[in-house]
Amino acid sequence: MKILLTGATGYIAKKLLPVLIAEGHEVTVCVRDRKRFDTTRFNAATLSVIEVNFLDRSTLERIPEDIDAAYYLIHSMSSSTGDFDEMEKASAMNFRERMNRTRVRQVIYLSGIVNTRLLSKHLASRKRVEEELSQGSYHL
């Protein structure tokens, strides 16, 4: 299976990537800076690295069209301007629009546990991302 892995320098993706490769999947990882991603531990035949910034639509065409599944592990809490919720929504929208132009059938999104009454700014943002991603032409 051809898998797209976003948020590849994050904790969860770092744990997930070796498992995906060990299972025999072809994995394309999205990173903002290729220099920050160490590929030496992996078989180059099953791993490709592309530089993509989901806030910059001009970079999204680097994502291959022939992917079967994608992991959305992007999280923008580190914004120095404090507008991480808008950044997260824009990233999710750009991701969704690009995925709609691929053959992806399944997107896996890791959210947070939310209730409908009282949400922190962080969890409200995660819920908005889920709502944005759920509008895609794939299973979420």
Language-model features: locations:
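N-terminal Rossmann NAD(P)H-binding glycine-rich loop of SDR-like oxidoreductase domains
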Residues: 3-25
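A short helix->loop->beta-strand "cap" motif at the edges of active sites that frequently abuts
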Residues: 101-106, 137-138
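NAD(P)H-binding glycine-rich loop region in Rossmannoid oxidoreductase-like domains
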Residues: 35-102, 114-116
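SDR active-site strand-loop-helix element
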Residues: 6, 30, 73, 107-112
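Conserved catalytic-site region of short-chain dehydrogenase/reductase
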Residues: 113-124
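Rossmann-fold NAD(P)-dependent oxidoreductase module
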Residues: 15-19, 98, 132
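Conserved glycine-rich Rossmann-like NAD(P)H-binding loop of the short-chain dehydrogenase/reductase
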Residues: 25-32
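Conserved beta-loop-beta element that borders a ligand/cofactor-binding pocket
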Residues: 111, 131-140
